[in-house]
Amino acid sequence: MKATLIFFLLAQVSWAGPFEQRGLFDFMLEDEASGIIPYDPDNPLISMCPYRCQCHLRVVQCSDLGLDKVPWDFPPDTTLLDLQNNKITEIKEGAFKNLKDLHTLILVNNKISKISPEAFKPLVKLERLYLSKNQLKELPEKMPRTLQELRVHENEITKLRKSDFNGLNNVLVIELGGNPLKNSGIENGAFQGLKSLSYIRISDTNITAIPQGLPTSLTEVHLDGNKITKVDAPSLKGLINLSKLGLSFNSITVMENGSLANVPHLRELHLDNNKLLRVPAGLAQHKYIQVVYLHNNNISAVGQNDFCRAGHPSRKASYSAVSLYGNPVRYWEIFPNTFRCVYVRSAIQLGNYK
């Protein structure tokens, strides 16, 4: 009996053919059946896929193929289209016709310098548009109103027009870093149409001041690696929902009195690698701030009430991280009670000045 059972199992193994990987998506299995979609003569749409691209589960991958133009024969039910790392120079009208179900379009790292104003018109459900690392000098016109995420960092954008974001009420995230943008190139009211914006990054540009008119809905603003020299109170006015402000690697010498009062819900303030001469005023009165990065500045003294309110602490939250290393002030010159409202001493990083 045992010999018969072993023979039966061996026979089953011998009938099974070797595994043959047919494509990148072999491991992306459907909920039912295998990961390979069989040809169905009654439904020719299943077999439609641009030459050399890979199509699976409404995802079309045409990346890293050296393409110089957008292919034309996409399955009409495509929801994600990946065209990154090619040599596409232009997006023409009709390039995405019939892709009414497309949610994500990835065009990163091409050579795109021109986009037709009608190119995105068919994309009535588009939520994510990735155009980073191209040669765009301005933002595309008539972007879909369904858009939630726009990434255009590392292009050649020099101006933001008021019309660029008109009607984009659903956008939550914008990435604009790595463009040769200046304050003079940002039109008054440029951000006015962004009613739901939560996150914006304008880092590594040529701006010298915090852009005016940022949406009040913002919770994170990242302006690292620019040429900002000071933070004045009006530049933060209205940002009542802001919880994180990144200003690292600028040339800031002062944060004006009253600036922090305009961001009452701020929890993280990154001011490291600037030229600050003193600790920003208003930290002690701020109820919610927990993280303050001030390392690698020119701070030569720290007052006893710079971080904690005089007398009994009235803060809602304790500091979880305060960095002061890389400043001229010596740690032994700082009074022990300076951080009396910090309950975990390991949160304080002093270090030495080089």
Curated annotation (Swiss-Prot):
PTM summary from the entry reads: The attached glycosaminoglycan chain can be either chondroitin sulfate or dermatan sulfate depending upon the tissue of origin.
Q: Which UniProt keywords apply?
A: Disulfide bond, Extracellular matrix, Glycoprotein, Leucine-rich repeat, Proteoglycan, Repeat, Secreted, Signal
Q: Does the keyword Glycoprotein apply?
A: yes
What are the disulphide bonds in this sequence? 49-55, 53-62, 308-341
The LRR repeats lie at 68-88, 89-112, 113-136, 137-157, 158-181, 182-207, 208-228, 229-252, 253-276, 277-299, 300-329, 330-354
One Gene Ontology cellular component term attached to this UniProt record is: collagen-containing extracellular matrix
What residues bear carbohydrate chains? 34, 206, 241, 257, 298
Xref: Gene3D superfamilies: Ribonuclease Inhibitor
Q: Which domain of life is it from?
A: Eukaryota
Q: What is its main location?
A: secreted
Point out the propeptide residues.
17-30
Quote any Pfam family the record assigns: LRRNT
Which compartment or compartments is the protein found in? Secreted, Extracellular space, Extracellular matrix; Secreted
- SMART domains (alphabetical): LRR_BAC (SM00364), LRR_TYP (SM00369), LRRNT (SM00013)
By its UniProt entry, which SUPFAM superfamilies does this protein fall under?
Answer: L domain-like (SSF52058)
Q: Is Glycoprotein there in the keyword field?
A: yes
Example of a GO biological process term: negative regulation of vascular endothelial growth factor signaling pathway
Record-linked InterPro entries: Leu-rich_rpt, Leu-rich_rpt_typical-subtyp, LRR_dom_sf, LRRNT, SLRP, SLRP_I_decor/aspor/byglycan
Q: Signal sequence: where?
A: 1-16
Question: A single Gene Ontology molecular function, please?
Answer: extracellular matrix binding
Q: How does it assemble?
A: Binds to type I and type II collagen, fibronectin and TGF-beta. Forms a ternary complex with MFAP2 and ELN. Interacts with DPT.
Functional summary from the UniProt entry: May affect the rate of fibrils formation.
PANTHER family linked: AGAP008170-PA (PTHR45712), DECORIN (PTHR45712:SF14)
Q: Which family does it belong to?
A: Belongs to the small leucine-rich proteoglycan (SLRP) family. SLRP class I subfamily.
Q: What is this protein called?
A: Decorin
Q: What species was this sequence derived from? A: Mus musculus (Mouse)
